UniProtKB/Swiss-Prot annotation:
Pfam families reported in the protein's UniProt record: RNA_pol_Rbc25, SHS2_Rpb7-N
Entry superkingdom: Eukaryota
Annotated organism of origin: Mus musculus (Mouse)
Gene Ontology, cellular component aspect: centrosome; nucleoplasm; RNA polymerase III complex
Keywords: Antiviral defense, DNA-directed RNA polymerase, Immunity, Innate immunity, Nucleus, Transcription
Function in brief: DNA-dependent RNA polymerase catalyzes the transcription of DNA into RNA using the four ribonucleoside triphosphates as substrates. Specific peripheric component of RNA polymerase III (Pol III) which synthesizes small non-coding RNAs including 5S rRNA, snRNAs, tRNAs and miRNAs from at least 500 distinct genomic loci. With CRCP/RPC9 forms a mobile stalk that protrudes from Pol III core and functions primarily in transcription initiation. Pol III plays a key role in sensing and limiting infection by intracellular bacteria and DNA viruses.
Name by which UniProt lists this protein: DNA-directed RNA polymerase III subunit RPC8
Primary localization class, coarse: nucleus
Length: 204
């Protein structure tokens, strides 16, 4: 679920931090820049693990700050495909079941990846597994807040870097706001034995 990623970046340290240890100042600046941010095709950055190399620092004309090229390792949330995770149901919609890990919310289990047969209860706004028994179908509700075990089957990165508006977008900008896309999304599945709500598989 978590991986160590080697990165390189140039860190700017302002003059008023020169009295501090260089490593402490660099660690603080790196965490300010990266913590809780999604790096495209890398994952969600959590925290600095260690600094492996510091190159020479430079002070440029007109800027009293030091600029240091830093090699470091960062803890990143990036689950492997087919990895099993446990989260909590954040909510349900016709699109599927939305799951949260607490620190990461952009997880969707689409209808075709639920235990089958499944239906969406419009009145309750929940997905229901119509579990077949000898006595007939038994409805198992996927309620908000329930713990759920799922398999990661796909991931999607979206480049959300700021770009200038096109002429078509500029014309329609006053009419409607564009839908904000998540920079990193996971797609899950519970369509196999042992997956789904933990309460479904708890032995008495």
């Amino acid at each position: 679920m978590f991986v160590l990623v080697e990165m390189v970046d140039t860190v700017r340290i302002p003059p008023w931090q020169f009295e501090r240890k260089l490593n402490d100042s660099i660690a603080e600046e790196l965490n300010k820049k990266l913590a809780n941010k999604v790096v495209y095709n890398v994952g969600l950055c959590i925290c600095l693990f260690d600094i492996t190399k510091l190159e020479d620092a430079y002070v440029f004309p007109g800027d009293g700050a030091s600029h240091t090229k830093v090699h470091f390792r960062y803890v990143v949330f990036h689950p492997f495909l087919d990895e099993i995770l446990i989260g909590k149901i954040k909510g349900c919609s016709p699109e599927g079941v939305h799951v949260s890990l607490g620190f990461f919310d952009d997880i969707l289990i689409p209808p075709e990846s639920l235990q089958q047969p499944a239906k969406f209860d419009e009145a309750e706004q929940v997905w229901v597994w119509e579990y077949e028994t000898e006595e007939g179908a038994h409805d198992l509700y996927m309620d908000t807040g329930e713990e759920i075990r799922f398999r990661v089957v796909d991931e999607s990165f979206v480049d959300t870097s700021p770009t200038g508006p096109s002429s078509a977008e500029a014309a329609s900008s006053s009419e409607e706001l564009p839908k904000k896309e998540a920079p990193y999304t996971l797609v899950g599945s519970i369509s196999e034995p042992g997956l789904g709500l933990l309460s479904w598989w708890t032995s008495n």
